[in-house]
Amino acid sequence: MRLLVTLILLIFVLTVSGQYSCSNPCYGNMCCSIPSNNEYYLTTFCDESTACGTPCSAQTYFTADSQRFGCGVTLTICSTSGGSTTTGGTGSAGTSTSSGSGSGSGSGSGSGSGSGSGTSGSSSSGSSSGSGSGSSSGSGGSSGSGSGSTMETGGFYGVCVKAITIDAGPNISVEEEAGMAIIDASSQICQDLFGSSSCGWSDKRSITAVQSSVEDGFPVNKPFNVTFEDYNKIISNSLILDQQCSNKNNCKYNKLELMK
């Protein structure tokens, strides 16, 4: 019985850990790769001694993960209840368009012939025969086209906050245990996005996190609501910042013209 329980636990651990694979392990015990869909679990921490030199008590909105983004980088973190995104493209919801057109034409021709004979009789007799042929042809055509469109804009996506990276981590073993990449952040972020003073990986509170700027037109030091259109703008800005960053390990994204 013990052997069976041990095997079940081993299979469970292997299944969970198999869900996450870091493509770029770094610094011996951390992961430097950024998920292609920008999705993470949110956890909370507060350390006075940090890799970037800024204590947690000096900031209200802060994160770790400097091994991924660099020290002092602004991140926009959003609850993902409204959707998800993938780096390399943007999508939108809350909008719809439709259009259509059609045309048709047809022609036809035909011919036929037939002959027959028959007899009937019991007390009388007779015969008859006949033949005939005919043909007909015709053609016709019709065409039409039409188009229409409908659009809805401004659909609510979710709640976001901006934060500054001040520390490295978490350990890659924690992410492997969680089965997903992790953003370790301040308790205020957990409170603003999920209404809780602390978040653990077992809570499975999903977020997206991307590089951003304090000058992109969105609020700082407080949570803010975003529409799908807003969120697509956030993602577009993050791509611009990433493409123009010359030093991936220490990039503060503070010199760019962004979408506002």
Curated annotation (Swiss-Prot):
Tell me the InterPro entries matching this sequence.
Diverse_Func_Domain-Protein
Name the protein family: Belongs to the dictyostelium lysozyme family.
Please give an example of a GO cellular component term from this record: cytoplasmic vesicle lumen
List localization entries: Cytoplasmic vesicle lumen
Q: Name one GO molecular function term.
A: lysozyme activity
Enumerate the residue ranges of region (Disordered): 83-148
* Record-given protein name: Lysozyme D
Q: Where is the composition biased (Gly residues)?
A: 101-119, 129-147
Report the protein's function: Has antibacterial activity.
Q: What class of enzyme is it?
A: hydrolase
Annotated signal sequence range = 1-19
Q: Which reaction does it catalyse?
A: Hydrolysis of (1->4)-beta-linkages between N-acetylmuramic acid and N-acetyl-D-glucosamine residues in a peptidoglycan and between N-acetyl-D-glucosamine residues in chitodextrins
| Keywords linked to the UniProt accession | Antibiotic, Antimicrobial, Bacteriolytic enzyme, Cytoplasmic vesicle, Disulfide bond, Glycosidase, Hydrolase, Signal
- Subcellular location, principal: cytoplasm
> Could you tell me the superkingdom of the organism this chain comes from?
Eukaryota
PTM summary from the entry reads: Contains disulfide bonds.
Q: Which gene encodes it?
A: alyD-1
GO BP term, pick one: defense response to Gram-positive bacterium
Give the source species: Dictyostelium discoideum (Social amoeba)
Listed EC numbers = 3.2.1.17
